[in-house]
C-alpha cells in the first residue's frame, strides 16, 4: 500500500486512485503516501461527468459505538470506507428504485476523513445522510488529508463488436433480507425468494437479473428487426418469461433442447401382480401372448408351467422369474427410479406442440453427459449468420436471479457462422429419443462431432484489434472417461495462456472438478492457477469457487457423524503454504450474527457462482485475455458435454469489465468465507462452534484499521491495479 510502511504523516494525501466498471458495478482502488493520522476512513463521491452531479456513495456499516439495526443507508460522510478499495454497487441502479441510469462517463473523488482537530475542515452536510435513522451518538467527520481522484471511465456494456452483461445474482446480502422483511435472527427462505424471482416484473426479480434478462430478450427484437431466424442450443429452459417469449416467436425458431434435471425416488413394492407384470413385459414373446389378457392372469398361468406350444423357452424362463418375484411380493426391496428432464419437461411439451420438427430433443438422460450449451445465433432474412448470444446464463429463474452469471453478445459474421456451423453439427449428431422422454438412456456424442470440435475457429473483431478463438465440446476422441487424462485441446490452449500471464489471473468457477491441493492435476483452471502461482511469486492468482468440493483441500464430512453433532463446515479459503500470491475462496453466507449483520440465504438451488470466467493480465493493452462461455473449465466439460468457450484477447475495456465482475463476487464472498473458516478452525480443535464469529462487524473509531493495509497483510490485490 503506502510507500513507507508505518510512517505517519500529518499532511497526508491520496497519491493514486484507479477505477473501472462493467454495466452494473464499479471497482476502485487507491493508495496514500503513508498512514494517515486519525483517519477513520474515506468519503467517496461519484461524479457524473455528463451532468456534473456529485453523489456520495451509500454506506450501511456503523461505527462500533453505534448500531444500524434496520440496515438503513447512510453515506460515506457518515460512515466512511475503512478499506483501500471499494465496489460501487449503485453505479447504475439504486437500492430503492427500479430506475436504471443511462450510460455515462464518471470518476470518483476519495477524501480521507477523521475526527475534529485544529485546522481540519468539517465535512459539509449531505442530503443523502439520514440523521436519526441509526442508534448511537453521531461522529462528525472532518477532512484529514488531501483528496485524490480516479481516472475517468465510461459506464457501458458496449466494448466494440462485443457487449457484455452481468446480473446481480447474489442472494446472501443484507439488502435482500431487508426487501424480504426477514425477521431478526432468521435467514430468508427459498420459498420466499422463489415467489419473487418467478414473477415477471417483480422488483426483486428485476434487480437481481440486472441487464442479463434485457440482453436475452433483445435477441427476439433483433430477429424481428432483421426478419431473421434464431437457432438456439439450450441446456435448461424453465423461466416463464423466457418460455413465453419463445412461444410468441416460435415461427422464427429452431431449437436444440437438451435434457435437464432428474428426480430419483424409491419405488414401492407393488405386490404379486405388479411383480409379474414387470418381468413379463421384459419378454417380447410373453408380451405378444398377453395382449388380450390381464397381467394377473398371466402370473397365475406362468405358475402352472406354460405349455411349449404357447411359449418359447425364453418365455418360460421369464415367466419362471416372475413367479419367483411374486412369492416375495411384500418382501421385495424398493428400487430407485429416476425420472429425467424434470426441469425442461413443461417447456418442451409446450414448444413441441407448436414447433414440431424444428425442436430437436437432445436427450442424454444420464449423469455422464449433458448438453450444457446456452447460446443463440441470429440469421438474417437471407440466411446469413450475423449475431451470437452466449455466456453462462441458463434460461431459468435461478439462472437469471439466484446465481452470478454473465451474457455476451458478439456482432460478427465470422463468429456467428462458426457458431451456426457448430449448431448444425449438434443437430446432425442425433441421439435416440426415449419413450417416454423421461426414461433413462446411455446416450453420448458421436465421433464426427468430436473430431470437428477438436479444431478451434479463430478470427478477429474490432477491425483486427481483438483476437477471438472459439472452442466447442466435446473435443476428445473417446466418449468415456480416459484412464490417463491427457489434457484436452481446449484446456491446453487455456493453460498455455495462463502460463504466459505476466501479472495476474482472476477467475470465477462453478465446479470445474475436484482439485488436487498440490496443484499436480492440471485438468482444471483452479489447479493450473495453483501451479503457475507457485512458479512465479509475482503472479497474483485470485478466484472464487461455488462448489465446496472444488476448493482445494476439501474433505468430505464423516458419513457416520451423528446427526445431533454440529457439522464442521468445509474449507472456505485456500492459499498454498508459502504461496501468498495465490488465494481462493468459496461462496458462503453469514450464518451467525455479527455486528448489525443478520443471517443470510446462500442459494435458491445448487449453483451460487455460476460464471465460468478467467481473466489474464486485464490491465495490459495487448496481453489481456477473457475466457468465458458455458464450459466449466475442467476436464469433464471437454470430453463429456456439449459446450462452447470464447477466448478474447487484446480488448482491455472488456477485460476490465469482466475483472470488475470477478472482484465484485470475490469481495462479497471473501468476508463471509473468512467467518466460516474461523468457525471451521475452532471446531477442528475440538471446541464448540462459537456463538458469534470472531470480529465485531463494525467500523473502528481509531486509525488502527489502516495497519494491516500498511503492513501488506491486507489488500494484496491492490498492488496490481495501482502499479
Language-model regions: role of each:
Residues 217-223, 227-229, 494-504:
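Short, contiguous, well-ordered secondary-structure segments
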Residues 208-221, 488-491:
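A short, well-structured juxtamembrane/interface segment
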Residues 204, 208, 411, 486, ...:
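Catalytic cores of large soluble enzymes that bind and process phosphate-bearing ligands
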Residues 2-199, 213, 217, 224, ...:
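PLD/PLD-like phosphodiesterase catalytic module centered on the HKD motif
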Residues 156-200, 208-209, 425-487:
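Active-site cores of enzymes that catalyze phosphoryl transfer or operate on phosphate-rich substrates
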Residues 419-422:
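Interdomain helical connector at the RecA1-RecA2 junction of SF1/SF2 helicase-like NTPases
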Residues 443-541, 550-552:
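Beta-propeller domains
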Amino acid at each position: 500500500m503506502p510507500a513507507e510502511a508505518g510512517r505517519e504523516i500529518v499532511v497526508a494525501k491520496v497519491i493514486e486512485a484507479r477505477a473501472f466498471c462493467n454495466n452494473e458495478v464499479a471497482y476502485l482502488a487507491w493508495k496514500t503516501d503513508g498512514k494517515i493520522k486519525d483517519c477513520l476512513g474515506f468519503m467517496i463521491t461519484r461524479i457524473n461527468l455528463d451532468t456534473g452531479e456529485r453523489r456520495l456513495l451509500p454506506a450501511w456499516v456503523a461505527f462500533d459505538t453505534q448500531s444500524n439495526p434496520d440496515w438503513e443507508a447512510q453515506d460515506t460522510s457518515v460512515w466512511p470506507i475503512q478499506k483501500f478499495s471499494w465496489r460501487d454497487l449503485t453505479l447504475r441502479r439504486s437500492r430503492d428504485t427500479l430506475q436504471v441510469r443511462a450510460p455515462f462517463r464518471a470518476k470518483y473523488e476519495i477524501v480521507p476523513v477523521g475526527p475534529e482537530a485544529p485546522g481540519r475542515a468539517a465535512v459539509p452536510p449531505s442530503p443523502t445522510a439520514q440523521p436519526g435513522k441509526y442508534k448511537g451518538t453521531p461522529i462528525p467527520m472532518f477532512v484529514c488529508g488531501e483528496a485524490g481522484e480516479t481516472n475517468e471511465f465510461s459506464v457501458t456494456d458496449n466494448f466494440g463488436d462485443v457487449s457484455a452483461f452481468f446480473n446481480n445474482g447474489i442472494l446472501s446480502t443484507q439488502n435482500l433480507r431487508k426487501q424480504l422483511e426477514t425477521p431478526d435472527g432468521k435467514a430468508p427462505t427459498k420459498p420466499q425468494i422463489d415467489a419473487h424471482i418467478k414473477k415477471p416484473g417483480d422488483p426483486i426479480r428485476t434487480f437481481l437479473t440486472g441487464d442479463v434478462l434485457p440482453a436475452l430478450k433483445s435477441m427476439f427484437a433483433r430477429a424481428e428487426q432483421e426478419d431473421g431466424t434464431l437457432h438456439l442450443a439450450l441446456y435448461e429452459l424453465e423461466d416463464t418469461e423466457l418460455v413465453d417469449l419463445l412461444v410468441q416467436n416460435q415461427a422464427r425458431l429452431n431449437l436444440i433442447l437438451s435434457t435437464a434435471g432428474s428426480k430419483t425416488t424409491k419405488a414401492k413394492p407393488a405386490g404379486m401382480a405388479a411383480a409379474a407384470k414387470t418381468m413379463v413385459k421384459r419378454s417380447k414373446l410373453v408380451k405378444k401372448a398377453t395382449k388380450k389378457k390381464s397381467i394377473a392372469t398371466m402370473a397365475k398361468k406362468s405358475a402352472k408351467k406354460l405349455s411349449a406350444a404357447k411359449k418359447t423357452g425364453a418365455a418360460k424362463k421369464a415367466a419362471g422369474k416372475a413367479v419367483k418375484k411374486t412369492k416375495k411380493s411384500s418382501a421385495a426391496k424398493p428400487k430407485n427410479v429416476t425420472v429425467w428432464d424434470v426441469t425442461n419437461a413443461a417447456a418442451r411439451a409446450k414448444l413441441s406442440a407448436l414447433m414440431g420438427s424444428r425442436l430437436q430433443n437432445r436427450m442424454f438422460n444420464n449423469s455422464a453427459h449433458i448438453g450444457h450449451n446456452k447460446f443463440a445465433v441470429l440469421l438474417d432474412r437471407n440466411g446469413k449468420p450475423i449475431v451470437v448470444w452466449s455466456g453462462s446464463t441458463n434460461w431459468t429463474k435461478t439462472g437469471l436471479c439466484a446465481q452470478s452469471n454473465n451474457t455476451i453478445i458478439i456482432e460478427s459474421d465470422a463468429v456467428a457462422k462458426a457458431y451456426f456451423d457448430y449448431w448444425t453439427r449438434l443437430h446432425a449428431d442425433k441421439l435416440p429419443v426415449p419413450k417416454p422422454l423421461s426414461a433413462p438412456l446411455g446416450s453420448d456424442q458421436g465421433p464426427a462431432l468430436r473430431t470437428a470440435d477438436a479444431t478451434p475457429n479463430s478470427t478477429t473483431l474490432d477491425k483486427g484489434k481483438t483476437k477471438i478463438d472459439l472452442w466447442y465440446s466435446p473435443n476428445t476422441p473417446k466418449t468415456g472417461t480416459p484412464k490417463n487424462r491427457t489434457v484436452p485441446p481446449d484446456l491446453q490452449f487455456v493453460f498455455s495462456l495462463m502460463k504466459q500471464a505476466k501479472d495476474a489471473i482472476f477467475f470465477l468457477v462453478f465446479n470445474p472438478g475436484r482439485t488436487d491441493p498440490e496443484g499436480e492435476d492440471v485438468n482444471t483452471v483452479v489447479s493450473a492457477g495453483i501451479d503457475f502461482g507457485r512458479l512465479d511469486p509475482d503472479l497474483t492468482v485470485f478466484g472464487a469457487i461455488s462448489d465446496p468440493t472444488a476448493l482445494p483441500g476439501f474433505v468430505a464430512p464423516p458419513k457416520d457423524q451423528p446427526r445431533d453433532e454440529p457439522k464442521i463446515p468445509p474449507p472456505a479459503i485456500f492459499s498454498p503454504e508459502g504461496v501468498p500470491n495465490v488465494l481462493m475462496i468459496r461462496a458462503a453466507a453469514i450464518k451467525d450474527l455479527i455486528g448489525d449483520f443478520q443471517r443470510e440465504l446462500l442459494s435458491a438451488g445448487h449453483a451460487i457462482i455460476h460464471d465460468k470466467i478467467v481473466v489474464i493480465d486485464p490491465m495490459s493493452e495487448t496481453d489481456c485475455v477473457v475466457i468465458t462461455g458455458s464450459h466449466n473449465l475442467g476436464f469433464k466439460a471437454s470430453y463429456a458435454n456439449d459446450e462452447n468457450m470464447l477466448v478474447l484477447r487484446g480488448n482491455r475495456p472488456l477485460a476490465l469489465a469482466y475483472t470488475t465482475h470477478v472482484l465484485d463476487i470475490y469481495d462479497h464472498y471473501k468476508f463471509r468465507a473468512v467467518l466460516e473458516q474461523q468457525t471451521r478452525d475452532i471446531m477442528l480443535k475440538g471446541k464448540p462452534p462459537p456463538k458469534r464469529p470472531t470480529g465485531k462487524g463494525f467500523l473502528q473509531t481509531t486509525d488502527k484499521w489502516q495497519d494491516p493495509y500498511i503492513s501488506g497483510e491486507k489488500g494484496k490485490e491492490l498492488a496490481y491495479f495501482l502499479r
